[in-house]
Amino acid sequence: YNFWDGIVKNKRYKQEEETCAKICEEALKDMGLWEIRNQLARNLPYGMQRRLEIVRALVTSPKLLLLDEPAAGMNEDESESLAGVIREISEKNKGITILVIDHHMDVIMSVCDEITVINFGSQLATGNPEEIQNNQEVIDAYLGVGD
């Protein structure tokens, strides 16, 4: 399958083909993938493959979207672009909770309303980006200072 077929076939079990195609088309356009929909996923650049993974999840209308290290392997420009995509998803899909797990704090700070920092399996802090950025325990953990 090209990736268009893969997405449409993923959604067919729930909806009529026409409705499914409309949802998939909108999601691909939102992610900037519509023009290349007939390509094979394996031939896409890495950043586009990550976007495609997000599209495949979104077309199922989830209440929770889990993004596990979505910026892994991306350069700074790709990470910034991805952060913009995540913000757009959040703004457009008000009924969805997006859980982002990532070590790229610039991405986390730019897309999250609430952040929980986990350090070696223990919850270190929870708060909005400003609170986390100014939390001395978080700063110390980031710098490797302390116990």
PLM ranges: what are they?
Residues 1-147:
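Glycine-rich phosphate-binding loops of nucleotide-dependent enzymes
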